[in-house]
C-alpha cells in the first residue's frame, strides 16, 4: 500500500492546517457520494486517503474546495424584518405571558415568588 504523506500534499497546499481542513471537506464529499468517479485503485481506499491522494496529484481544485467549504459554513437563514404593524403586534402578544421576575444579588427575592406546576395550579415552593 502506498502511503500519502503530508509532504506530497504540501507542494499543493503549503499550510498543514489548511490542508487538513480542505482534505477533510473533500473526504466528507466523497463519503456522501457527491463525487462518485473512483479509479480501480481507489475503490478499496477510504475517503480521507482518496482525498489526500487527489490533492497531492493536483486533481482537485483547491479554490473550488475552499469556496465549497465557505458556502457550507455560511448561514442560510435570513431573518426578514417585520413589514407592518399587525405583524409586530402578533409577535408582542406571543410574549405577553412572560412574567416579570426581579432577582436580587442574593436571590432572596425568589422566596416570595409563586410558581405554577405542570397542571397549571399555583405551587408555593418550600423555603
UniProtKB/Swiss-Prot annotation:
GO biological process: DNA-templated transcription
Domain of life: Bacteria
Example GO molecular function: DNA binding
Alphabetic keyword roster: DNA-directed RNA polymerase, Nucleotidyltransferase, Transcription, Transferase
UniProt key word 4Fe-4S: no
PANTHER family: DNA-DIRECTED RNA POLYMERASE SUBUNIT OMEGA
Name of protein: DNA-directed RNA polymerase subunit omega
Organism lineage: Bacteria, Pseudomonadati, Pseudomonadota, Alphaproteobacteria, Rickettsiales
Amino acid at each position: 500500500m502506498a502511503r500519502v504523506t503530508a509532504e506530497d500534499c504540501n507542494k499543493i497546499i503549503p499550510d498543514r492546517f489548511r490542508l487538513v481542513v480542505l482534505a477533510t471537506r473533500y473526504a466528507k464529499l466523497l463519503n456522501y457520494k457527491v463525487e462518485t468517479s473512483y479509479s480501480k485503485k481507489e475503490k478499496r481506499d477510504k475517503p480521507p486517503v482518496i482525498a489526500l491522494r487527489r490533492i497531492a496529484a493536483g486533481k482537485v481544485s483547491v479554490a473550488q474546495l475552499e469556496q465549497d467549504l465557505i458556502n457550507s459554513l455560511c448561514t442560510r437563514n435570513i431573518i426578514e424584518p417585520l413589514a407592518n404593524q399587525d405583524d409586530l403586534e402578533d409577535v408582542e402578544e406571543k410574549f405577553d405571558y412572560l412574567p416579570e421576575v426581579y432577582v436580587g444579588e442574593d436571590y432572596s427575592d425568589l422566596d416570595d415568588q409563586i410558581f405554577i406546576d405542570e397542571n397549571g395550579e399555583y405551587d408555593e415552593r418550600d423555603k
